[in-house]
UniProtKB/Swiss-Prot annotation:
It comes from Pasteurella multocida (strain Pm70). Pfam families: Flavodoxin_1. Residues 5-144 form the Flavodoxin-like domain. It comes from the Bacteria. This is Protein MioC homolog.
Length: 147
């Protein structure tokens, strides 16, 4: 049986949600069990074994408001996540010096909790990428090959 993938989206204007929904459709077509969560709370996802976090960067390099509570609670929770495998897709704007800092935040926090990063994160510059769904789709095999 294929690995269940919990896709967690952090979005302010909807771009990350569109990417996540597109990736979820592709994974389902390939018979992966998928759980798509737009801004879940801690209890809803803490026991999942594989996270694909799709997030934009908001404000001064912060996580979007809809996933900030999840990662804030995780940061102060004593639970280690040695059983969790993860990858991150980030959307950002390279005009800002905080380009894709939300990706960095997610990576650093999950690694500090002993989670295993499956592959290099995808950092998309929305100034140059016109089709983020397609770009994420092109990255997806890199993620899947590590499951």
């Amino acid at each position: 049986m294929k690995t269940k993938i919990c896709i967690i989206t952090g979005s302010t204007l909807g771009g990350a949600e569109y990417v996540a929904e597109h990736i979820a459709e592709i994974l389902e077509q390939q018979d992966y069990p998928v759980r798509l969560e737009h801004g879940p709370n801690f209890e809803e996802v803490i026991d999942e074994k594989c996270w694909l976090v799709v997030t934009s960067t908001h404000g001064a390099g912060e996580l979007p408001d809809n996933i900030k509570p999840l990662f804030e609670k995780l940061a102060f929770h004593p639970k280690q996540l040695a059983d969790l495998r993860f990858a991150v897709i980030g959307l950002g704007n390279s005009d800002y010096d905080t380009f894709c800092h939300a990706v960095d935040h997610v990576e650093q926090l999950l690694l500090s909790k002993d989670a295993l990063q499956l592959c290099e994160s995808l950092r998309m510059d929305m100034l140059t990428i016109t089709d983020p769904e397609h770009t994420a789709e092109q990255w997806l095999p890199q993620f899947l090959s590590q499951l």
